[in-house]
Amino acid sequence: MNQLSERERAVLLEALDDEYHAWATYDQVITDFGDVAPFTNIREAEARHIEALLSLFHLFSLQAPHNSWPGRVERYPSLLAACEAGVSAEVANAGLYDRLLATTESPEIAVVLRRLRDASQQRHLPAFRRCVERQRDGGVAQQGCNEGSGRRWRGGRL
């Protein structure tokens, strides 16, 4: 396997840190509000995103850091606030992945980053937007905010 540049190592570290942060945030929401959709589904998806990135660390023989985010993420006063934060995070996620994609020459890295960005924009963002709408329309916490079906990637959904 080709050696990665320092920039590409930094790309992988930044992407993994972002996915770790997302997972820890959604896990905290579940801790605070219970098993509520779309957080339960998207937390599972974030775990698959982490697995996809960890496979790249393995492919390039890099040591992956552990997730340092649990217990260090923002907490929200309501499920509506958490859903709104989810929208903002997924919007920002697209910009992050576009920036990271512009700096890598590795086709293996680019494929994974594109899939993660697309999952975020095509599934997570709409799920959080629906959740915001439903929370504003009556505080429906456990029904109707489902993420929807996802695509498969190497044995797991993204």
Q: Where do the language-model regions lie?
A:
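Non-heme di-metal
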Residues: 1-158
